[in-house]
Amino acid sequence: MQLPHQHNVIMTLPASAPQQAPTRVYRMAAMLLGIGSLHFIAPKPFDSIVPAELPGSPRFYTYASGVAEVGIGAALLAPKTRRLAALAAVALYISVFPANVNMVRLWFQDPSKSLPMRIVAIARLPFQVPMILEALKVYRAS
């Protein structure tokens, strides 16, 4: 025996997007907090990709981007600051892109870097786009 309007049950289930929003926020916050912390725990790899054209010490930029990443990651966890933090994440992802491009340039000039390492350096460049899009989704949903 079929219940009345049984076919509507599937169609009226809540959309999964709102349920994924907290996961998106927590994933982004965890990534920023983790990578940001690494800027202080092991700064040398980050120092090495700071473009030489920038004035001042590479360590300054390593620590500054680490502070930004940790701060944005923490701000994403608080609903009151989430919207602004998501917008800051977009700006951060755009601002560190030149360092990622510089890493590709440096690794292709360094004979000690293997071909797989060079490929990884290039392959990670397009990942900035989905990171920016995820931050924009958090911004719009906050």
Which functions belong to the PLM regions below?
Residues M1-S142:
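Short amphipathic, positively biased membrane-proximal segments
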